[in-house]
């Protein structure tokens, strides 16, 4: 019987399967950070339990980390969370990359860098964007703190079996279209609830043509489409990325495991509970205008008018979003001015993202009145970027070059957008207050964010490149 990759991984990890009840799944990798783990470790202590598989548990500090002076942690709660993680990892024998470690960074960036993320795995973390790791052909999803404790104690997790959803991107992408544009276009077209109760498999020629870092961007925002997780069947691109990484088998063992990984791909003729298709050729550089990731459009479009709404519920949603964003209905996206630019986050802070931004920025200057930040996703990315001279490109243009961390993606560290000001951000969420109280967030790709920094407003980066302005 033909099966999807989702079914293959789920079935191979099911420990308990009772009719009408959630399945008990074995967990291959449990990633931990400082924000969602303190109560979980305390629960272990109170119950007199240990961590069942410390060798399959990995920790880092990322959410609260300052990106200017990493050790100047002025918020007492943030400091306590970081100190508590270090103490817990020491007590329970868990590997942790702290602020001094050369591999420190955002958990969803360093996991793949270190080869911890591998095809066929079930991966969990107390963070919603764990779906990033699905790019490798893994079922990866975020969990709550009580579930973190359960996984620490048992290396298993109870989960209801999800439905399967295929999102097929047909044809080839036009030049200048990024993975971020693709996932934003998918969410804008199908809505933020298209994936509810499902795990998405992304398929199609456009997906196969993407690098692993681009695939990570796609899967990262599966959660913004309402899905439990998102993944892509592994192929030679996946295997080439993983070969030689620290935690990946070497020599004959590598050849053997690649043979197993290759068997994970969805079988020809396998069926999904639902399939939807988007034409790659219709996707243009995207900009969100509202307060959820589905409220977005191509740069050539305008913010919707209230009369464009298909229902009274949608009309109210548009009105509320535009009131918060302080944008008039019908405003062309290319007329929206910005005061801040943030290039970073677990969505778009890898080396290829920084290269894309640098290609636009090179030889140009940040517009007057715009504050622009570049925050690498890991210290490894920062080091590589500096070796290539990308940091000089950014600094000469007027960007602030920072250390790694979650930074301005969320207002849990010193990097915030002031109230009432507008940010072009490569992160994944544009909810009210996400980047700071009263902050207004527009989600875009690294290239589009770079172009906005130069122009002081949203522009079609393809036209900027074609005109020789960068």
Swiss-Prot record:
Q: Matching Gene3D superfamilies, A to Z?
A: Aconitase, domain 3
Write down the required cofactor(s).
[4Fe-4S] cluster
Q: Which CDD domains match?
A: IPMI (cd01583)
**Which terms does the record give in the GO molecular function aspect?**
3-isopropylmalate dehydratase activity; 4 iron, 4 sulfur cluster binding; metal ion binding
Positions annotated to bind [4Fe-4S] cluster: 346, 406, 409
> What Pfam families does the entry give?
Aconitase
| Keyword entries, A-Z | 4Fe-4S, Amino-acid biosynthesis, Branched-chain amino acid biosynthesis, Iron, Iron-sulfur, Leucine biosynthesis, Lyase, Metal-binding
The cofactor binding remark recorded in the entry reads:
Binds 1 [4Fe-4S] cluster per subunit.
Pathway listed for it?
Amino-acid biosynthesis; L-leucine biosynthesis; L-leucine from 3-methyl-2-oxobutanoate: step 2/4
Q: Which domain of life is it from?
A: Bacteria
According to its UniProt record, which reaction does this protein catalyse? (2R,3S)-3-isopropylmalate = (2S)-2-isopropylmalate
Describe the protein's quaternary organization and the partners it interacts with: Heterodimer of LeuC and LeuD.
Similarity annotation:
Belongs to the aconitase/IPM isomerase family. LeuC type 1 subfamily.
Q: Which NCBIfam families match?
A: leuC, PRK05478.1, PRK12466.1
Function of the molecule = Catalyzes the isomerization between 2-isopropylmalate and 3-isopropylmalate, via the formation of 2-isopropylmaleate.
Know the name of this protein?
3-isopropylmalate dehydratase large subunit
Which organism is this entry from?
Shouchella clausii (strain KSM-K16) (Alkalihalobacillus clausii)
């Amino acid at each position: 019987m033909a099966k999807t990759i989702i079914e293959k991984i789920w079935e191979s990890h099911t420990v308990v399967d009772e009719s009408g009840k959630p399945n008990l799944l074995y967990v291959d990798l449990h990633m931990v950070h400082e924000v969602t783990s303190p109560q979980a470790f305390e629960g272990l202590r109170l119950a007199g339990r240990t961590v069942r598989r410390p060798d399959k548990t990995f920790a880092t500090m990322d959410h609260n980390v300052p990106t200017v002076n990493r050790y100047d942690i002025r918020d007492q709660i943030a400091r306590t969370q970081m100190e508590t993680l270090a103490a817990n990892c020491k007590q329970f024998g868990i590997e942790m990359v702290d602020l001094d470690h050369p591999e420190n960074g955002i958990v969803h960036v360093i996991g793949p860098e270190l080869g911890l993320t591998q095809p066929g795995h079930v991966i969990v973390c107390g963070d919603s964007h764990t779906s990033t790791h699905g790019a490798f052909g893994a079922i990866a999803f975020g969990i709550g703190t009580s579930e973190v404790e359960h996984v620490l104690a048992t290396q298993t997790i109870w989960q209801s079996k999800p439905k399967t959803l295929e999102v097929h991107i047909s044809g080839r992408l036009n030049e200048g279209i990024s993975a971020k544009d693709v996932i934003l276009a998918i969410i804008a077209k199908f809505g933020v609830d298209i994936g509810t109760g499902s795990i998405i498999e992304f398929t199609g020629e456009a997906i196969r043509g993407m690098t692993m870092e681009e695939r990570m961007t796609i899967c990262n925002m599966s959660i913004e489409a309402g899905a439990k997780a998102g993944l892509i069947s592994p192929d030679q691109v996946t295997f080439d990325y993983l070969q030689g990484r620290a935690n990946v088998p070497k020599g004959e063992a590598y050849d053997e495991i690649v043979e197993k990984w290759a068997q994970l791909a969805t079988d020809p003729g396998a069926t999904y509970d639902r399939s939807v298709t988007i034409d790659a050729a219709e996707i243009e550089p995207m900009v969100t205008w509202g307060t959820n990731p589905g409220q977005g459009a191509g740069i050539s479009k305008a913010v919707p008018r209230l009369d464009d709404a298909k229902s009274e519920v949608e009309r109210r949603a548009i009105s509320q979003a535009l009131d918060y964003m302080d944008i008039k209905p019908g405003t062309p996206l290319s007329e929206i001015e910005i005061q801040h630019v943030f290039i970073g986050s677990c969505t778009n802070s890898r080396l290829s993202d920084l290269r894309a931004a640098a290609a636009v920025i090179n030889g140009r200057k940040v517009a007057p009145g715009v504050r622009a930040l570049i925050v690498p996703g890991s210290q490894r990315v920062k080091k590589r970027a500096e070796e290539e001279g990308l940091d000089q490109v950014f600094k000469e243009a007027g960007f602030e070059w920072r250390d790694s961390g979650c930074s301005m993606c969320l207002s849990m560290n010193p990097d915030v957008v002031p109230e009432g000001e507008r940010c072009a951000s490569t992160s994944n969420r544009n909810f009210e207050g996400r980047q700071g109280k009263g902050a207004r967030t527009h989600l875009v790709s690294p290239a589009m964010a770079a172009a906005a920094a130069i122009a002081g407003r949203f522009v079609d980066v393809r036209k900027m490149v074609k005109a020789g302005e960068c």
